[in-house]
From Swiss-Prot:
GO BP terms: heme O biosynthetic process
Summary of the function given for this chain in its UniProt record: Converts heme B (protoheme IX) to heme O by substitution of the vinyl group on carbon 2 of heme B porphyrin ring with a hydroxyethyl farnesyl side group.
Protein name: Protoheme IX farnesyltransferase
CC terms in the record's Gene Ontology section: plasma membrane
Residues that span the membrane, as ranges: 43-63, 65-85, 119-139, 140-160, 168-188, 195-215, 238-258, 261-281, 292-312
Catalytic activity, as annotated: heme b + (2E,6E)-farnesyl diphosphate + H2O = Fe(II)-heme o + diphosphate
Note: Carbon 2 of the heme B porphyrin ring is defined according to the Fischer nomenclature.
InterPro entries from the UniProt entry: Protohaem_IX_farnesylTrfase, UbiA_prenyltransferase, UbiA_sf
Keyword Transferase among UniProt keywords: yes
Length: 317
């Protein structure tokens, strides 16, 4: 776990001098370098957000024709956009990441991508590639993708992350943009349903991040990142966390009444929502780090299963 940090032991003078000469000529192989450049994009995070976009394309495709090429092009665009945003964010956060046990082994602080500016250039390259693909779709899709990247990198990473306790609430708006993009890529417009679904993702983000911040509370405090559970007394922070989970579940049910859904989505929203509420109430009544970890580990499957149920519901019509 993150609270078990291992130290780095200095070598003896003789061994250190000998190993210095030896390691000075060692170069990482292509495989290790490629792995580092993939890792800096946070592929698991990219996969989840891209999945929300793919699900929205399937949902929109129930009433609008979707070619295979459009689907692939849009999916590739959102993958590159999210990957680019994460790579730039890792460059911005390199000093903070180097001080946290959870993040110090990331490619930039660990030196696997060096100099650090290479992560920045890699992210910017992915930005440009994603915007080029989105431009071939339609203007609304391009704007939502551009807005999502700017929101994450500029509003969250550069501006709010180290300045405001509400960093993830405001900056989290960018997390809903892939869902909006998926809908816009197919329809060329934005309507109430995709806005509500994007809002659901935005409400999911505080639950996801704050539960992690509770578990790593001491580390966030040490690097002076004002996450709400770090700045506020824990009970007050849990009040806000529980509120966002309640709103998230309410929105998931509201989406059923706004869209043309069947019982698959409704049943999934109710069951997964009940589980999210139960875990949140559990930690609210008895605040413990391990319960925060359980809530964090549940949050990603919650979102993935909910969006999967949207696609299954459409396929079964």
């Amino acid at each position: 776990m993150g609270d078990r940090l291992t130290g780095l032991h200095a070598p003896t003078t003789e061994a250190g001098a000998a190993s210095a000469d030896h390691t000075a000529v060692v170069r990482p192989g292509f495989r290790d370098t490629a792995k580092a450049y993939v890792e800096v994009t946070k592929p698991i995070s990219v996969g989840l957000l891209a999945f929300t976009a793919a699900a929205m394309m399937v949902v929109a495709g129930a009433t609008h024709p979707v070619s295979g090429w459009l689907f692939v092009q849009a999916l590739l665009a959102v993958v590159l956009a999210c990957a680019g945003a994460n790579a730039v964010s890792c460059y911005v956060d390199r000093d903070m990441d180097a001080q946290m046990g959870r993040t110090r082994r990331r490619p930039v602080p660990s030196g696997r991508i060096s100099p650090p500016a290479r992560a920045l250039y890699w992210g910017l390259f992915l930005f440009v590639a994603s915007l080029g693909l989105a431009w071939n779709l339609n203007p609304i899709a391009w704007i939502t993708l551009w807005g999502g990247m700017l929101g994450y990198v500029v509003v969250y990473s550069l501006w709010l992350k180290r300045r405001s306790v509400w960093n993830i609430v405001i900056g989290g708006v960018s997390g809903g943009m892939p869902a909006l993009f998926g809908w816009a890529a197919v329809t060329g417009e934005i309507s109430l349903l995709p806005v509500l679904i994007a809002a659901l993702v935005v409400l999911w983000i505080p639950n996801h991040i704050w539960s992690l911040a509770i578990f790593y509370r001491e580390e966030y405090a040490r690097v002076k990142v004002p996450m709400l559970p770090v700045v506020y007394e824990l009970r007050r922070a849990l009040n806000w966390l529980l509120l966002t989970v309640v709103l998230m579940v309410v929105f998931s049910v509201l989406i059923y009444f706004v869209g043309d859904w069947g019982l698959v989505y409704l049943a999934t929203a109710l069951v997964m929502g009940a589980a999210a509420l139960a875990l949140s109430v559990h930690i609210y009544r008895n605040p413990e780090r391990r319960k925060a970890w359980v809530l964090f580990k549940f949050s990603s499957p919650y979102l993935a299963v909910l969006f999967l149920s949207m696609m299954v519901d459409v396929w079964l019509r």
